[in-house]
């Protein structure tokens, strides 16, 4: 039987050098680590890792080749009160595995035990890691390096974006390949998108609870192997990595960046009753935040929380991020529940992972976007992330909806959000682009549902409509649900136009949810995380071409306005912005706080956004000069307006002088 050589303690994971494979695994509390390899017949062969450098266990298997399936058995104490849950009867996934063979099914054998260990062996059904070799021809690929001030983000799901697209070949719909198909790329270019932000593509598992209900995790925020691509989005699991890189290369050639939504806050092992896949059995005490009683701190709402202040876990997370940049050429990350990244356990801007990213010559050069909260006390950290990060701006989302759909936001508050929320983000040398403005996202109502539903309708999720937020700031315009009279449809359309205009012509970095430009509806489901079906897949055959054209025209208009593209804070008198009332005069203090919802925003002294958010037709006196409405607010025959715009109720228009 082949013997393992000691090998090297770096890099993490399994790496083929042409002669064999080097294996490394971190565990500070293990007493012994077995490498388990499986031949073509499924026969298991076990080897003790002979090397032990600090907390890294390692060994080298001569003559091993790519395609080898493997896992680990980790020996150590079973002491739940101290946070130790070692169980060598369970085969474990390498946290740095780059490919997984097998499915993460709901099976009692994939549990370690709660108070007492479950010593039933699970190697026959446990997923296995696969050794991969990294040879890929990137040709002349180069990152687009789109300046932040010019960035337009499009948030999309790999499958949902293309699964029903009639012009994409059936055999690749819903896959990585479809992202790089010319039809998809041409669409994104025509729309004006500069960055495609993908919901999680790292391998994830469906929670046992969902599997028992016949559902699955659709969004992907339940990670199990952070270095491995989710195989369900590939035409073939064996070629997933190349399919993904082909798509990125094609998008880059079109000048479109790729941003990955990544989940560095919890794992699919969930709470103590959850499955055992990897980290819990490798070194539970190090990988997770553990309470004094040995249970998990659940600061994520998912049962566990990664301890990203532990040096080894910081190294793991940093290596993961570098892998996606260096191996797949991704251009940035959106971090789910990113406040966890800064916990020590208190949130700190100089937390170890933040410091590691800032000091890394690779990671410090890509786009970094935080979802700036978690669910723990002190978890709401909007505006408090380090300068390298942009942040989701929920202030903007709520303000835009309240102003246009609830009519209860003063002009001053609306203007503050329109101006990149400088009260929140203008600190530590940050620029307006640090504010990622959004009206909708994957989590919550779609834009169409914002104007069609007053209440969530999440019954299909199997939780009796308890899940999902109740704070939607939506307005059904008088009738719950889709459809209605022509007048109702037109009023809803006007609200959609107003919200899109606010999003795409405001200062900051706009993020558009895929499908909003089509009029996509999830029929009132504002938490469709487990709906892998036509509720979430974009139906291109039903897309509103008029709304798509309206959205594209807004994006292209944005790119013509210097005040929005220069990424500089607006200052009084700098010519970037003037705020005027309905009479084209500067607003008084009282008008800012108590005035009617009528406002004129003059950008770069040439572009005028006239707003009448009241319920009555109102005359808006335009500033001096000859003005004409511009697309998407007027057709080819634009009359010159020299004095007054008859502002329709709940309407707005953009003019150019």
UniProtKB/Swiss-Prot annotation:
Region described as Disordered: spans on this chain: 460-479
Gene3D superfamilies reported for this sequence: Glycosidases, Golgi alpha-mannosidase II, Immunoglobulins
CDD domains referenced in this protein's UniProt entry, alphabetically: AmyAc_Glg_debranch (cd11326), E_set_GDE_Isoamylase_N (cd02856)
GO molecular function, one term: glycogen debranching enzyme activity
Marked site (Transition state stabilizer) residue numbers: 443
Positions annotated as active site in the UniProt record: 336, 371
Enzyme's top EC category: hydrolase
Pathway: Glycan degradation; glycogen degradation
Reactions that this protein is recorded to catalyse: Hydrolysis of (1->6)-alpha-D-glucosidic linkages to branches with degrees of polymerization of three or four glucose residues in limit dextrin
Domain of life: Bacteria
UniProt KW keywords: Carbohydrate metabolism, Glycogen metabolism, Glycosidase, Hydrolase
EC number: 3.2.1.196
InterPro entries tied to this protein: GlgX_C, GlgX_Isoamylase_N_E_set, Glyco_hydro_13_cat_dom, Glyco_hydro_13_N, Glyco_hydro_b, Glycogen_debranch_bac, Glycogen_debranch_GlgX, Glycoside_hydrolase_SF
GO biological process, one term: glycogen catabolic process
Pfam families reported for this sequence: Alpha-amylase, CBM_48, GlgX_C
Family membership: Belongs to the glycosyl hydrolase 13 family.
Its job: Removes maltotriose and maltotetraose chains that are attached by 1,6-alpha-linkage to the limit dextrin main chain, generating a debranched limit dextrin.
The name this protein goes by in its record: Glycogen debranching enzyme
Organism: Escherichia coli O1:K1 / APEC
Protein encoded by which gene: glgX
């Amino acid at each position: 039987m082949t013997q393992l050589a000691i090998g090297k303690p770096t890099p993490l994971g399994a790496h083929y050098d042409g002669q064999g494979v080097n294996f490394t695994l971190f565990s500070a509390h293990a007493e012994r680590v077995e490498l388990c390899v499986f031949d073509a017949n499924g026969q298991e062969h076990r080897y003790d890792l002979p090397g032990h450098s600090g907390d890294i266990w390692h060994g080298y298997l001569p003559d091993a080749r790519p395609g080898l399936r493997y896992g680990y058995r980790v020996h150590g104490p079973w002491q739940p009160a101290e946070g130790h849950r070692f169980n060598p009867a369970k085969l474990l996934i390498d946290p740095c595995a780059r490919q997984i063979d097998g499915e993460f099914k709901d099976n009692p054998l994939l549990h370690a035990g709660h108070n007492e260990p479950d010593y039933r062996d699970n190697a026959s059904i446990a997923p296995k890691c696969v050794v991969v070799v990294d040879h890929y021809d990137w040709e002349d690929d180069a990152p687009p390096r789109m300046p932040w001030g010019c960035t337009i983000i499009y948030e999309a799901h790999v499958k949902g974006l293309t699964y029903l697209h009639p012009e994409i070949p059936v055999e690749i719909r819903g896959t990585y390949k479809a992202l790089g198909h010319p039809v998809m790329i041409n669409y994104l270019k025509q729309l004006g998108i500069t960055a495609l932000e993908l919901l999680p593509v790292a391998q994830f598992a469906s929670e046992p609870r969902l599997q028992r209900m016949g559902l699955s995790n659709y969004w992907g925020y339940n990670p199990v192997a952070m270095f491995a691509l989710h195989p369900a989005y590939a035409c073939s699991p064996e070629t997933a990595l190349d399919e993904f890189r082909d798509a990125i290369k094609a998008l880059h050639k079109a000048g479109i960046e790729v941003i990955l939504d990544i989940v560095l806050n919890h794992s699919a092992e969930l709470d103590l009753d959850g499955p055992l896949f990897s980290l819990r059995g490798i070194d539970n005490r190090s990988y997770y935040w553990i309470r004094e009683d040995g249970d998990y701190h659940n600061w994520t709402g998912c049962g566990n929380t990664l301890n990203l202040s532990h040096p080894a876990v910081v190294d793991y997370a940093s290596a993961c991020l570098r892998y996606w940049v260096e191996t797949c050429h991704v251009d940035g990350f959106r971090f789910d529940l990113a406040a966890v990244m800064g916990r020590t356990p208190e949130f700190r801007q100089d937390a170890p992972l933040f410091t590691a990213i800032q000091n890394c010559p690779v990671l410090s050069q890509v786009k970094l976007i935080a979802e700036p909260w978690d669910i723990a006390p002190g978890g709401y950290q909007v505006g408090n992330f380090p300068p390298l990060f942009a942040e989701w701006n929920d202030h903007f989302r709520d303000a835009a909806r309240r102003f246009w759909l609830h009519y209860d936001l003063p002009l001053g508050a609306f203007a503050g959000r329109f101006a990149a929320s400088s009260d929140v983000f203008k600190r530590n040398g940050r620029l307006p682009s640090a504010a990622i403005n959004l009206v909708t996202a994957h989590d919550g109502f779609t834009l169409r549902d914002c104007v069609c539903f007053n209440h969530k309708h999440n019954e299909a999720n199997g939780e009796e409509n308890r899940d999902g937020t109740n704070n939607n700031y939506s307005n059904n315009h008088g009738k719950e649900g889709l459809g209605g009279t022509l007048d109702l449809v037109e009023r809803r359309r006007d609200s959609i136009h107003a919200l899109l205009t606010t999003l795409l012509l405001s200062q900051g970095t706009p993020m558009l949810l895929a499908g909003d430009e089509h009029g996509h509806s999830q029929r009132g489901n504002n938490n469709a995380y487990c709906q892998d079906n036509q509720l979430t897949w974009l139906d291109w055959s039903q897309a509103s071409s008029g709304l798509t054209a309206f959205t594209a025209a807004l994006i292209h208009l944005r790119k013509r306005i210097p005040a929005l593209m220069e990424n500089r804070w607006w200052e009084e008198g700098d010519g970037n912005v003037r705020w005027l009332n309905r009479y084209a005069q500067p607003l008084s203090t009282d008008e800012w706080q108590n005035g009617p919802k009528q406002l004129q925003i003059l950008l770069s002294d040439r572009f005028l956004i006239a707003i009448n958010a009241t319920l009555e037709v109102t005359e808006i006196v335009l500033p001096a000069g000859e003005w004409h409405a511009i697309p998407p607010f007027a057709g080819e025959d634009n009359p010159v307006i020299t004095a007054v715009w008859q502002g329709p109720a709940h309407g707005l228009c953009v003019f150019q002088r």
